[in-house]
Swiss-Prot record:
Organism: Pelodictyon phaeoclathratiforme (strain DSM 5477 / BU-1)
PROSITE patterns: PEPT_TRNA_HYDROL_1
GO CC terms, sorted: cytoplasm
Keywords associated with the record: Cytoplasm, Hydrolase, RNA-binding, tRNA-binding
Subunit field text: Monomer.
Site-annotated residues for Stabilizes the basic form of H active site to accept a proton: D91
Protein name according to UniProt: Peptidyl-tRNA hydrolase
GO molecular function: peptidyl-tRNA hydrolase activity; tRNA binding
Length: 190
């Protein structure tokens, strides 16, 4: 059994924001299997799919980004899933838009959802798939305003290209593991 977690914020005002691209990614995965989200274990919404014989639990923490670790730990404990079998999908301001990056482990890199998951698990050793949201090299005056802002029309076009590839990468992880997914998907998408 695998666990895929899409990070985001739960209120409707955050729909379509850069910070909620993790939610968009897992919604795309669930929809491709005809699965719907319902109340999950702890403070999350969950969908269940079977991919090539592998059971996959997909969750969207309803705790707000900065407390995502609570929902991850609750799902891991309930389903008895180990760290090697989880994949966290989130936005990454350090990656250019049009890029996804899978890693087997690592720091939070400034992403507060990942930071809380690391604190909650007591380890950086879990897979993550980061979706680049940086649109240019100009310095930002407010990181929070940018990540909580809605995608521009041009950015939406890029995200529509990325989401199916993100879905494929996540599903590759569930069957073949993080190393295989990294080898196949760590490259610019656009």
């Amino acid at each position: 059994m695998k666990l895929i977690v899409g990070l985001g914020n739960p209120e409707s005002r955050y729909i379509g924001t850069r910070h909620n691209i993790g939610f968009s990614a897992v919604e795309k995965i669930a929809a491709s299997f005809g699965a719907n989200f319902s109340k999950g274990k702890g403070k999350s919404l969950e969908a269940k799919i079977t991919h090539r014989g592998e059971q996959v639990i997909i969750i969207k923490p309803m705790t707000y980004m900065n407390l995502s670790g609570h929902a991850v730990v609750a799902a891991m404990n309930f389903y008895k899933i180990v760290r090697n079998d989880i994949l966290i999908i989130c936005d990454d301001l350090n990656l250019p838009s049009g890029t996804i990056r899978l890693r087997a482990k690592g720091s939070a890199g400034g992403q507060n959802g990942l930071k809380h998951i690391i604190e909650s698990l007591g380890s950086e050793e879990f897979a993550r798939l980061r979706i680049g949201i940086r649109v240019d090299e100009t310095s930002l005056t407010s990181f929070s305003s940018f990540v909580l802002g809605k995608f521009s029309e041009n950015e939406k076009v890029v995200m529509e290209k990325i989401l199916p590839i993100t879905s494929d990468a996540a599903l590759d992880f569930t069957i073949n593991g993080i190393e295989h997914a990294m080898n196949n998907y760590n490259k610019p998408v656009t």
